[in-house]
């Protein structure tokens, strides 16, 4: 079907309950995959589905057959258009556990549990301060990184904050807090600096500074977005702090202050 594709985009009609069209574009070696004549294929979803799961592509003698299962958008909390909307992303979930390291008592601690605990605290702080708050994960299950980004875009969020925990197995003494932003986003960089400064001041965490990264949730979101690496689980002392409810509260109060500091630097909504 795509064998005659030339440089420049073209589209194919489809008969599908999930997809409205298939677009394709023949590239040279400009997508970074290291292969000549890269073909990029985009599947456009019909209304009523926010993303598709279980996509299969089967080649046949007469063409290519594409099937998928639609996934309906999850129910969202009420959003007041007169307030700022912040999407909070608790890193990992029940399938992608994230880092797993033992605490001082030898009990395995899961990154997914720490991030969700911190996000719940941050949610409560921001709600109390008058923000709209949307969670990408409220429990053990969540969409993948692209689905989390799409959710933030769909609710037209003003800010996106992803909470994670770091690890450095070869340097167990390493500790501290990093905040990441997408390399080409000046607004995300400014947001990252505001969060980094406030979170470190509130918690006393070692300030590792801000850094750029090509993370999916930073690249695919349309708003100012940051990913906070709250500390190193491979450092037993820092892991003890990360597990402490009081420390988590101070840390998230700092992140919330960074949210406010950044938004206060912008024209009023």
Predicted regions and their residues:
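Signal-peptide-cleaved, periplasmic/extracellular N-terminal interaction regions immediately downstream
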Residues: 1-85
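Active-site histidine-acidic residue metal-binding/catalytic motifs
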Residues: 68-151, 155-157, 169, 175, ...
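Active-site-adjacent mobile loop/cap segments within catalytic or ligand-binding domains
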Residues: 162-170, 211-269
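Solvent-exposed loop/turn segments at secondary-structure junctions
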Residues: 92-95, 109, 138-143, 165-170, ...
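Structural recognition of the beta-strand scaffold that forms the well-ordered cores
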Residues: 85-89, 132-137, 159-163, 171, ...
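Sec-exported extracytoplasmic/periplasmic mature domains
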Residues: 120-132, 153-157, 196-205, 243, ...
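Extracytoplasmic/secreted envelope proteins and their assembly/folding machinery
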Residues: 40, 116-123, 146-149, 189-196, ...
């Amino acid at each position: 079907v795509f064998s005659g594709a030339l440089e420049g985009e073209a589209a194919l009609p489809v008969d599908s309950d999930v997809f409205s069209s298939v677009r394709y574009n023949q590239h040279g070696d400009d997508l970074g995959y290291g292969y000549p004549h890269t073909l990029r294929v985009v599947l456009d979803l019909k209304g009523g589905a926010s993303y598709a799961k279980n996509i299969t592509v089967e080649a046949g003698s007469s063409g290519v057959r594409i099937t998928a299962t639609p996934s309906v958008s999850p129910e969202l909390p009420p959003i007041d258009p007169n307030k700022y909307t912040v999407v909070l992303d608790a890193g990992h979930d029940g399938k992608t556990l994230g880092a797993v390291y033992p605490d001082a008592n030898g009990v395995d601690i899961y990154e997914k549990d720490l991030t969700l605990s911190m996000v719940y605290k941050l949610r409560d702080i921001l709600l109390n301060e008058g923000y709209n708050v949307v969670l990408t994960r409220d429990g053990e299950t969540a969409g993948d990184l692209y689905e989390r980004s799409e959710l933030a875009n769909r609710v037209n969020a003003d800010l996106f904050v992803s909470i994670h925990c770091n690890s450095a197995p070869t340097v167990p003494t390493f500790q501290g807090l990093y905040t990441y932003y997408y390399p080409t986003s000046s607004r995300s960089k400014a947001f990252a600096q505001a969060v980094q400064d406030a979170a470190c001041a509130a918690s006393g965490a070692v300030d590792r500074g801000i850094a750029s990264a090509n993370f999916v949730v930073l690249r695919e979101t349309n708003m100012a977005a940051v990913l906070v690496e709250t500390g190193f689980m491979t450092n037993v002392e820092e892991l003890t702090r990360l597990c402490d409810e009081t420390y988590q509260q101070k840390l998230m109060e700092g992140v919330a202050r960074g949210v406010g500091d950044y938004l206060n630097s912008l024209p009023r909504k």
